């Protein structure tokens, strides 16, 4: 691995690692966060396509790519809602674990990954470790009924959101479209969800000011740039002449460590010393298990 490939591979670490913390720090409701995030992603993707001279795909490739973006934005709204319940430092390891589980199971049952019995044994052991690691990051030394109820609600929300994240990764595969060409139409799908969600909330509560007219929604464009930067650098990192799919994937998953720690440090999502130790061990288990899923 050369230096340039490593730097590009660390792009998702910075982008996806800082994205949830920045979105939470800027503030606003989930609708404000999804508007800014998707608009920022669209701007980033549009500039990238113009600079690279990439034409918008057509036909099934366009439709599947837009569906991919719709899936991501729908899931991300639910993830933002989970932040309001348990904070990003607890929500991010859970959603990362669910995405790893979803991606791995899709690969096994739909794409024929882990063909041998030994591969399956190692792979499913890794999935069990991912679940263990995610549970450890949510462990609380001083439990209360209220906090336990919030955590259960957040887990259910994130589990439902996994359907959208699965569509985000699986839909482009259905069209067999290159990731860089799917980038802009994915952003279009994301923006459609954000606008529809904002309009729905305005119709539901006419007396409330539309999120599309609130300044905080457009401040969130900054967080969208971080997400888009991570998504683009991951596409580049996963190319065979860079880090390759397996190494690129492992490097990208390290973002959960940064997302969790910055949530604790900068958003003051406090943990006791014991909780911090257990959280760090849980994060290490998730990263180690993610590595296992791509080497079998």
Swiss-Prot record:
InterPro entries referenced in this protein's UniProt entry, alphabetically: Sugar_transport
Organism domain of life: Bacteria
Localization, UniProt: Cell membrane
Membrane-spanning ranges: 2-24, 34-51, 58-80, 90-112, 121-139, 182-201, 221-240, 245-267, 276-295
Cell membrane is among the record's keywords: yes
Principal subcellular localisation of the protein: membrane
GO molecular function, one term: carbohydrate transmembrane transporter activity
Keyword Cell membrane appears in the UniProt entry: yes
Keywords assigned: Cell membrane, Membrane, Sugar transport, Transmembrane, Transmembrane helix, Transport
Cellular component per GO, a single term: plasma membrane
Pfam families reported in the protein's UniProt record: Sugar_transport
Topology with respect to the bilayer: Multi-pass membrane protein
Function: Could be involved in the uptake of ribose.
Record NCBIfam families: symport_RbsU (NF047342)
Family: Belongs to the GRP transporter (TC 2.A.7.5) family.
The protein's name in its UniProt record: Putative ribose uptake protein RbsU
Species this chain originates from: Lactobacillus johnsonii (strain CNCM I-12250 / La1 / NCC 533)
